[in-house]
Structures are given as C-alpha cells and as structure tokens.
Regions:
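Phosphodiester-processing cores and adjacent nucleic acid-binding clamps
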Residues: 1-206
Length: 206
C-alpha cells in the first residue's frame, strides 16, 4: 500500500506499532518495513507497547533487506508505561485496595472482585481533573542509539515486568536514570506525561 502523496525526503517515523501492541496496532513488523521502503523512506522505529516481542522479527527482516543491497536502518524501541515513582505507585495501589475493601465491607455488599482495583485502559489516555494519580499510566517512547542503548532498552523492559507489573509493566524516573545511557527518550502521544500536564494546565510541574 502506497501513500497518496510522496513523503518528505528525510522523514523517519519514530513511533510505530504492530500487532504486538494489543488493540493498538496491526500486522507484522515486516509489513510495516515494506510499507516504509515502498514509500521512499529508509528507516523506521518499532515501538510496541510495553514489550520488545516484535524486535527480533524486525531485525530479521531488516537483515534480509540489507543483504539484497537496499539501504535500510531498523531503529529499536518500545513505548513504555511510565509512572513517576514505582514505590509511591505501589503504596497508593495497596492503599486503594484497602479503601475499596473497607467501603465494600461497610456497605455489606458482596462482590466477586472485592479487594481488587480495576484499571481501565481508556481512563489512562483521557484528561480528567482530580483523577487518582495512581490510576494513570503515562506513555513514554524510548529508542536505542547504539548497542549499549539496546542493552539498556531490554533491561528496562525486563525490569518493567519484574518491578512494576500490575496488568501492565511500568518503569519510573529512577529506573530510567539508571539505564539511560545510549537511549533517546521522547514524549510519545497524548498519553505522555507532558502532554497530560499541558492539557491539565500544569505543564511546568516537576
């Protein structure tokens, strides 16, 4: 499938999703790479949500393309789920469970999900003043500059599942600072932390 108009000469997409981003992308990485080449671009960043499952597929297809003599650069990345502090998030989450359980007990209402707190994916992408901060999962796009960065990218993905997993894997400022070498970090989409703050009127808040 080609674009209706020619792309800018040096345009490179730095935020892309495939079928490995559940409910947010379609197709295999190879489909996207072929589309990029077909439309005159010679590089593309794969940044699936919270995982690197498609990166090996992209790498294999990129190698095949280069061996055929065509110029192409695969940029390896991930769109992380992000909270400012995993420690604070865990504390807030546990307190929310306690508060919810207490409210249910007080109302003498039996429910199969008693003691559990359910997150809604759409809620994390919308701007709601006064929303409980622990429910937010900001989005953060990170791409690797080099081999060191690629190693740190994989480490962050692993730590997101080990240290910050509840329904979705998360990282925080502390982890990002610890494994920042060789990485490019961008603000992602409207689900990004700075986009949210701009929309909520407190963009300068640290």
């Amino acid at each position: 499938m080609s674009l209706l108009i020619p792309p800018p000469t040096r345009f490179v997409g730095l935020h892309g999703h495939t079928g490995f981003s559940v409910f947010d992308g379609l197709g295999y990485p190879s489909d996207h790479i072929d589309f990029v080449l077909e439309n005159g671009m010679d590089a593309w960043a794969l940044t699936d949500h919270g995982n690197g499952s498609g990166l090996a597929h992209a790498h294999k297809h990129a190698e095949k393309i280069r061996k055929s003599g065509r110029k192409y650069r695969q940029i390896y990345g991930c769109e992380f789920y992000f909270v400012p502090s995993l420690t604070q998030w865990k504390d807030d989450y546990e307190q929310a469970k306690i508060d919810r359980a207490a409210a249910k007990a007080k109302a003498l209402k039996e429910d199969t999900d008693a003691g559990h707190v359910v997150e809604n994916e759409e809620e994390t992408k919308t701007i709601q003043i006064g929303k409980d901060e622990w429910k937010r999962r900001y989005h953060l796009v990170i791409t690797a500059q080099n081999r060191v960065g690629l190693g740190n990218l994989f480490t962050l993905i692993k730590r997101a599942y080990m240290d910050g997993f509840y329904r979705y894997p998360r990282i925080d400022w502390k982890l990002l600072k610890q494994y920042s070498e060789g990485l490019n970090v961008s603000t992602a989409c409207l689900g990004g932390i700075y986009s949210n703050r701009i929309m909520r009127g407190n963009a300068l808040k640290k």
